[in-house]
Swiss-Prot record:
Gene of this entry: hisG
Protein name: ATP phosphoribosyltransferase
One of the record's GO molecular function terms: ATP phosphoribosyltransferase activity
NCBIfam families, A to Z: hisG (TIGR00070), HisG_C-term (TIGR03455)
GO biological process: L-histidine biosynthetic process
Covalent S-S links between cysteines: none
Organism the protein comes from: Halobacterium salinarum (strain ATCC 700922 / JCM 11081 / NRC-1) (Halobacterium halobium)
Cellular compartments annotated: Cytoplasm
Activity regulation annotation text: Feedback inhibited by histidine.
The family this protein is said to belong to: Belongs to the ATP phosphoribosyltransferase family. Long subfamily.
GO CC field: cytoplasm
Cofactor(s) required, per the database record: Mg(2+)
């Protein structure tokens, strides 16, 4: 199996880190390499521009890919399917215009000019409005186009809004909300290796924000302990050598651990151990 991932940019390092946490470590190689081996001999990484990854998968150069939802929408390929939201690389694609201008709604741009690196998404967006602007495709520095009288407004990616504020642009409307996704060619929908990769990545996401709690407790206070630690489907209870004592293990949301420890001690729990969870497979 071949999976395409971003070769550089803000998505490159987080993607490789996620693969590593999922047990799919990518072997180091020379710069500018196209392919990289992983710890799984049956799985190879293909490095590509984030914007090109949907086309690589659609054309069969890769079986699956990891890139932003915005890039998937912009490519407009119809033979791939999103498999999993990986919950990083979050951003918004917004319609923005000069703060001191007259554009306060999409309708104000009828007959105007809109600059963007996402012409496909932008045309689809305006097709659902009453405005019909001219869409001008640019390849960078989109936020500058209104100030050089190249465009009346822009459609561009923003994460924090800082770049828009620096360039005295205000958000008129949100066009699209995006994050990084795992997707695959529809022809490999039931492929075991694709499903294995999806399961591995999902296990990392499912473990996020959870802790594994282990403790000893008096057997006659087990119901009280269970009330504090419901766990996933109930806590695991194990017999120990000491009579009248049981060991209890449970997966607990991280936000609940602080209060849970106090409540557990109050019902006689001891030897409480809290550990991180790297992966959680349901």
């Amino acid at each position: 199996m071949r999976i395409a991932v971003p070769n550089k940019g803000r998505l490159h390092d987080p993607t490789l880190a996620l693969l590593d946490r999922a047990g799919i470590g990518v072997e180091d190689g020379a710069d500018r390499q196209l392919y990289a081996d992983t710890v799984d001999p049956a799985l190879t990484v293909l490095y590509a521009r984030a914007a090109d990854i949907p086309e690589y998968v659609a054309d069969g150069a890769a079986d699956a890919g990891i890139t932003g939802h915005d890039q998937l929408r912009e490519s407009d390929v119809d033979c791939v399917e999103e498999r999993l939201d990986l919950n990083y690389g979050s951003c918004r694609l917004v319609l923005a215009a000069p703060e001191d201008g007259d554009v306060t709604a999409p309708a104000d741009l009828d007959g105007a000019t809109v600059a963007t690196e996402f012409p496909t998404i932008t045309r689809a967006y305006f097709a659902d409005t009453t405005a019909t602007p001219e869409i001008v495709e640019v390849t960078g520095a989109t936020e500058l186009t209104p100030h050089v009288e190249m465009a009346d407004a822009i459609v561009d990616i923003t994460s924090t809004g800082t770049t828009l504020r620096v360039n005295r642009l205000q958000v008129v409307d949100e066009v699209l909300s995006s994050s990084v996704r795992l997707f695959a060619h529809e022809d490999v929908h039931d492929d075991p290796k694709v499903q294995q990769v999806e399961t591995a990545l999902r296990s990392v996401l499912d473990a996020h924000g959870k802790r594994y709690v282990m403790l000893n407790a008096p057997a006659d206070r087990l119901d009280d302990v269970k009330a504090v630690l419901p766990g996933l489907g109930g806590p695991t209870v194990l017999d120990v050598d000491e009579p009248g004592t049981v060991a209890v293990h449970a997966v607990v949301p991280e936000r609940d651990v602080f209060e849970a420890i106090s409540e557990l001690k109050a019902v006689g729990a001891s030897g409480i151990l809290v550990t991180e969870i790297e992966r959680l497979v349901d």
